[in-house]
Amino acid sequence: MKDLLNLLKNQGQVEEFDAIRIGLASPEMIRSWSFGEVKKPETINYRTFKPERDGLFCAKIFGPVKDYECLCGKYKRLKHRGVICEKCGVEVALAKVRRERMAHIELASPVAHIWFLKSLPSRIGLLMDMTLRDIERVLYFESYVVIDPGMTTLEKGQLLNDEQYFEALEEFGDDFDARMGAEAVRELLHAIDLEHEIGRLREEIPQTNSETKIKKLSKRLKLMEAFQGSGNLPEWMVLTVLPVLPPDLRPLVPLDGGRFATSDLNDLYRRVINRNNRLKRLLDLSAPDIIVRNEKRMLQEAVDALLDNGRRGRAITGSNKRPLKSLADMIKGKQGRFRQNLLGKRVDYSGRSVITVGPTLRLHQCGLPKKMALELFKPFIFGKLEMRGLATTIKAAKKMVERELPEVWDVLAEVIREHPVLLNRAPTLHRLGIQAFEPVLIEGKAIQLHPLVCAAYNADFDGDQMAVHVPLTLEAQLEARALMMSTNNILSPANGEPIIVPSQDVVLGLYYMTREAINAKGEGRVFADLQEVDRVFRAGEAALHAKIKVRINETVNDRDGNSVNNTRIVDTTVGRALLFQVVPKGLSFDVVNLPMKKKAISKLINQCYRVVGLKETVIFADQLMYTGFAYSTISGVSIGVNDFVIPDEKARIIGAATDEVKEIESQYASGLVTQGEKYNKVIDLWSKANDEVSKAMMANLSKEKVIDRHGDEVEQESFNSMYMMADSGARGSAAQIRQLAGMRGLMAKPDGSIIETPITANFREGLSVLQYFISTHGARKGLADTALKTANSGYLTRRLVDVAQDLVVTEIDCGTEHGLLMTPHIEGGDVVEPLGERVLGRVIARDVFKPGTEDVIVPAGTLVDEKWVEFIELNSIDEVIVRSPISCETRYGICAKCYGRDLARGHQVNIGEAVGVIAAQSIGEPGTQLTMRTFHIGGAASRTSAADSVQVKNGGTVRLHNLKHVERVDGNLVAVSRSGELAIADDFGRERERYKLPYGAVISVKEGDKVDAGAIVAKWDPHTHPIVTEMKGTVTYVGMEEGITIKRQTDELTGMTNIEVLDAKDRPAAGKDIRPAVKMVDDNGKDLLLPGTDVIAQYFLPANALVGVADGAKIAIGDVIARIPQETSKTRDITGGLPRVADLFEARRPKEASILAEVSGTIAFGKETKGKRRLVITPNDGSDPYEELIPKWRHLNVFEGEQVNRGEVISDGPSDPHDILRLLGVSALAKYIVNEIQDVYRLQGVKINDKHIETILRQMLRKVEISESGDSSFIKGDQMELTHVLVENERLNAEDKFVSKFTRVLLGITKASLSTESFISAASFQETTRVLTEAAVTGKRDYLRGLKENVVVGRLIPAGTGLAYHSERKRRRDADKPLRVSASEVEAALTEALNSSGN
């Protein structure tokens, strides 16, 4: 009976827990874990292979080596369980207790724990307020530290070297206590009175003025409060007892040949035990101090190496000269405990094989080789065979399966029916890398994959392998079928567009069947219905491309969603009529009445999904594929060398270019142009020539002449095989055809610069040796790039997933009214992304009014779908405030309204959706497509001439946005602000284009004017920066003395004289401090004031300014007083591609970032200091002026006396996101980062929805910095979680106390991941040691809210179906609280019941 009870006891349910706390272990605690002390360094006996007693593998301490058998063999078998053998002292138990039981080593002298000593910032150092260097000198026995000064002049914590110590001894005798080593440190830590220290620090902080000191004090204060709050004692950072890991976690395995393979930990432990025992002996013998000291130091080093080898000094190496793997190395890195065993586990019931095409499969099927299926579904087959009575035992069933009897195959077919399997292709970059399919048994050994899912897997059939996994439990099968089935994943989660889109052969076939040809057989016939067309085509009476008329019946949905039948006669071709047969009801014939290129097919599937739903779309996609394959086979499209038609104009174009290049070469030789100009001109020339050749070639390829049925010669689109492939989007592009039939063009060197001599040949003509050599140069770089890119992109994805992993949709609506203002994304005047596309799938945050009225046309809280988008565009709305993940106020997670539509499903997102991970995958997955290189704006890569005017593309009405301007005498406006924009709106009031207007631009239209397309509405000189007057008057020169501050220059060509202001460093001593200016006076010579201010109207002239007005001249409003020549923009590398995305997400400050105005006010320049200008902004509200020093070489956009607004650009350069956040707020930052990241992806043609980037941004903006602590417990300058601060402020508000004030902080993704609330998540990401050290000292609790923490502790994740499980568990536990019974009570009750039943 007792055995039964014990069994029950052992089977006890794992304790349910809500949080995991990490802390420091006290010596008592370490002893309480221990099952005995390890006293000897021996491991096992080399003859008997039995563990030595009291050694590192001792069976008495750790438990038996064999199940239920003591070491000497006296007690064997289960009946003796729990007996302790009197001979060998081993308890009879399961051998697996050797994985759980720990031991300890009593250290003869205390030892500092290296993590708390060396992991920066040193915790021991902070607490004791000593530098790490000093503490190390004490610990490693180089100097003494005063512990108790007694009545002497020494101070507590003072360091003494040997000499000073002996002097002090002579002077004071035994009045003071100074020691060295870890015991001294332990004494000092023990003596710290936390409460007293905390009080002292809290008083001290407000009284100090120096920033650095405040920082240091608040760091100490934080640490002390952490110790006080967590119940850890400071002296526990010094070890007096060392725990020993269970032996089966550091195994010793005999190899053949009498050698052993051992874990490095055993060596490290042996070293510690040896030194510890030697030290004990020396202390017993009371050996000389110097020997003991040396031994103590060696013990300290041995323990250091065991805990974290290599952290201090040289790493201890084993016999093979490799550093030994210490405890810290066991848990960190890719091979460490976290990433290898806790986050990534191996999967049972899986197989892998090569994939081949399965063109006959349905979308939800995959072909599974019989051999594989038999192995994967073995347990199910055994069960079925037994159930059927075909086999009596499992053993018999096994035999049947091994012999592969015919009934086994029948049973297999039955088992497999409707049992989905998961197919996965590595690398799994997004969630579509694992999908579920129903298996179909096939012969052969390769898995068959449906061609349409290849895009999602990024798979091709050149030898790719895929893995198959079997979902075993009913729940797993259910989830696989309902959520992961390939038919449920038609849309891409990244952008909401179909990802099940035909490509290659299928596209070619569909394109071929929907093309029209002139004068094909059967042209002009009229058919009664589609069936008739089909019959005539099969009979060979009409060609596939013939133009015909057909009467069709279509069912279309009208605006209200009701289906309407429609009969009409349409002009079409035979192929299109045939294709319409597979189109589902509800779509109009117009969707197929055009040549089906790849984009058109994608649109068709998208429309099908939105109009007729999922099921029809899946059937339709399959039908499209079958049709496409059939007709691409019939088409017989193939390429021969004669398809590459070389244009006749090629030779002429190349000849002309060569002549021009010769001309430039001769100019260079005679010194008329510089090397750089020559290079740029030549490259420009060749790129132009290349474009001309390719234009001629495409014109040649794309058209062919045919005879129509009237006998005339007409042109039609070509049926050239290569042209059809490129035009349909099946394979190849114009650029590739250009290399085959045009000219290869300019080649790049590995550093991105372009080689001057182009390759004039194409692949049809063949390359010469030199040409081939030139082209290999850049091609190798491409391959090397790809390898690097994959690794970098993977690392970016990992950081993104880590920062966003705990973001899950946790509620329907957080009730916020905030959001982001959405406007169309306009670049260089073009609308790149219309408003409709940007708000699709978002929830409107505030009512949208009809322009110019008070009528609400879109109420707040509307989820914008395709119909609403049409409606918004019809009503010409050009800005909408939408809910956004950034402004969501849900505390943990995010609400469904702020996220909007689940892109992969097309409806509002469900609670439990792991939107953070989806966002990270959507951004990271296309990472490999981005380029690695930084673009040189040089050569032909991407050179644009500087813009000098605005020419409108569409006619419409002019709108001017935040433009300050003055009106000139001739009626034109002159811009006097920097951020002005000019927009053109159409008749509906929709903005079609938008242009930036620089300072000094002359605008020839006014607000509300009508302009025609092509009109030039503004002009400026791109190479100079004007200074414009805002009033009329007479010019007076101030401080402009020739030869001292200015020099006169006469232009040789025009004979005009200019006055140029000299740079301060070129002036004679007399002119160094004079600041030349132009002052405006009225006719009586009185100073004029700037309009609306009491500032004298004088314009200070910067160095090199050219003054164009004479002293005493009369000028009018808007005239230019002076021009500052602008250096032509230096060719700086623009970081593009992947590195740019990484920089933005890491929130790195760019080099030479643009300088923004910190406050709104008036600009003035103060006294210059060495090499810097002093910029002073006087705020308009009369507060203190703001000063900033700016290096002289920075080009400033502002002049003395000018008004700027907070956040306006003062000096150009790349923007610093931190500045944008600080000065312009969260929404400006969101707009900037979203646009910048989208620009990189758009360049590669990748579509990602904005909300994914916003989701990551939300995680980067989690933290705030406390600027005033109010009555809260926060310290000024602390970084806290935003939600934490808001909750605390709510509490303070309720108690009528002062709340804390804070500013938002932007963290890069790596930093944000490391500073999450969960230490498990942070530790498993990077810098494991540092994270765990900090968490242990502060006694952190991890509430397991994210996904990663739950995976690590082995639970379901709180997302998707797991979220329901977690909330249900919580609900049950809350209901059960009072009913909790302790285990001992249950045991007592059971025992009593059993005893009373008479045993």
UniProtKB/Swiss-Prot annotation:
Binding of Zn(2+) 1, residues: C70, C72, C85, C88
Catalytic activity line of the entry: RNA(n) + a ribonucleoside 5'-triphosphate = RNA(n+1) + diphosphate
Pfam families membership: RNA_pol_Rpb1_1, RNA_pol_Rpb1_2, RNA_pol_Rpb1_3, RNA_pol_Rpb1_4, RNA_pol_Rpb1_5
EC number in record: 2.7.7.6
Required cofactor(s): Mg(2+); Zn(2+)
Keyword vocabulary terms for this entry: DNA-directed RNA polymerase, Magnesium, Metal-binding, Nucleotidyltransferase, Transcription, Transferase, Zinc
Cofactor note: Binds 1 Mg(2+) ion per subunit.
GO molecular function terms attached to this record: DNA binding; DNA-directed RNA polymerase activity; magnesium ion binding; zinc ion binding
GO cellular component labels: DNA-directed RNA polymerase complex
Domain of life: Bacteria
Binding positions for Mg(2+) per the UniProt entry: D460, D462, D464
Residue numbers binding Zn(2+) 2: C814, C888, C895, C898
Transcription in keyword set: yes
GO BP annotation list: DNA-templated transcription
Cross-referenced InterPro entries: DNA-dir_RpoC_beta_prime, DNA-dir_RpoC_beta_prime_bact, RNA_pol_asu, RNA_pol_N, RNA_pol_Rpb1_1, RNA_pol_Rpb1_3, RNA_pol_Rpb1_3_sf, RNA_pol_Rpb1_4
Similarity comment: family membership: Belongs to the RNA polymerase beta' chain family.
Assembly, per entry: The RNAP catalytic core consists of 2 alpha, 1 beta, 1 beta' and 1 omega subunit. When a sigma factor is associated with the core the holoenzyme is formed, which can initiate transcription.
Name recorded for this polypeptide: DNA-directed RNA polymerase subunit beta'
Species of origin: Pseudomonas fluorescens (strain Pf0-1)
